[in-house]
């Protein structure tokens, strides 16, 4: 996975994240650290001032108090909220779709589409 670049939208016009080691940067110039995975915690910002995600089992919580379930990975689907009322991402074949109607491509790899294997690898990398 190394130094692949994430693009947002079907036209791949905007770089979202660049994964290098365990650091994820925002933008093409890598000027800001978004996530730094340390154990089971992911921090926002270079000073690690705020806990953004805390992965426990297959649940991902938002905030330090783990008061809200942000994502719950169930098979190939990722759901938002505790009631799983809305499908946030559903990857099928080599595309990652946003929303329940799969109307928009949410993410695409540089140098090819995001495959199902790469999507699984990305989720695995973020959870380990």
Predicted regions and their residues:
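Long terminal segments
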Residues: 1-23, 27-32, 38-40, 46-50, ...
């Amino acid at each position: 996975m190394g130094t692949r670049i994430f693009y947002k939208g079907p036209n791949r016009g905007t770089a979202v994240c660049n994964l290098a080691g365990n650091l994820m940067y925002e933008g093409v110039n890598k000027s800001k650290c978004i996530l730094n995975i340390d154990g089971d915690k992911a921090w926002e910002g270079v000073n690690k001032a705020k806990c953004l995600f805390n992965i426990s089992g297959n649940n991902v919580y938002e905030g330090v108090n783990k008061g809200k379930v942000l994502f719950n990975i169930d098979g190939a689907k990722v759901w938002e909220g505790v009631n799983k009322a809305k499908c946030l991402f559903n990857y099928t074949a080599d595309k990652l779709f946003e929303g329940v109607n799969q109307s928009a491509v949410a993410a695409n790899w540089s140098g090819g589409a995001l495959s199902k294997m790469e999507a699984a690898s990305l989720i695995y990398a973020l959870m380990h």
